[in-house]
Amino acid sequence: MFDVFTRVVSQADARGEYLSGSQLDALSATVAEGNKRIDSVNRITGNASAIVSNAARALFAEQPQLIQPGGNAYTSRRMAACLRDMEIILRYVTYATFTGDASVLEDRCLNGLRETYVALGVPGASVAAGVQKMKEAALDIVNDPNGITRGDCSAIVAEIAGYFDRAAAAVA
């Protein structure tokens, strides 16, 4: 797992080069948006239970077969596993957002997840739909201008959306 700074320095070091002006500019922008990044992570973390439960509720309303007898979320044990998995994906999205790098999400959460779901008979499209619902809820919370560092947050919002999209694509 690398943060954005470690990744840039490692890449330059591997090439035996100094950091370029564009790399320094990108790192400066990351520092400048640091409070917005922390605010976004705090907001998602503070609302994690609601994000997960509302996304699951919406998913099961759209796909009621999941919670009916024989469905992949039928029985409290399977429902708990589904909610746990959604929470884990959301948690790793916050880690990626905080570090500004998707490697923690990829390496520790998404790597092999599709294969695991296939082996367990879990419908990947349903998991992807749940991830998209979490994305919508999280972005609504992050985009709320009240009580957050003022300024343009569009880059962070796009970054967060990209992490959710990456997670949805990994399980679909």
From Swiss-Prot:
Protein localization: Cellular thylakoid membrane
Question: How does the entry describe its membrane topology?
Answer: Peripheral membrane protein
Residue numbers bearing the N4-methylasparagine modification: N72
Superkingdom per UniProt: Bacteria
Which GO terms are recorded in the biological process aspect for this UniProt protein? photosynthesis
Q: Name one GO cellular component term.
A: phycobilisome
**Kinase is among the record's keywords:** no
Q: What is its main location?
A: membrane
Q: How does it assemble?
A: Heterodimer of an alpha and a beta chain, which further assembles into trimers. The trimers assemble into hexamers, although these were not seen in the crystallographic studies. Part of 2 PBS rod complexes, the conventional CpcG-PBS rod and a photosystem I-specific CpcL-PBS rod, both of which include ferredoxin--NADP reductase (petH). Interacts with rod linker CpcC2 via the latter's N-terminal PBS-linker domain.
User: Which PANTHER family does this UniProt record tie to the protein?
Assistant: C-PHYCOCYANIN BETA SUBUNIT, PHYCOBILISOME 32.1 KDA LINKER POLYPEPTIDE, PHYCOCYANIN-ASSOCIATED, ROD 2-RELATED
Q: What does this protein do?
A: Light-harvesting photosynthetic bile pigment-protein from the phycobiliprotein complex (phycobilisome, PBS). Phycocyanin is the major phycobiliprotein in the PBS rod.
Q: Under what name is this protein listed?
A: C-phycocyanin beta subunit
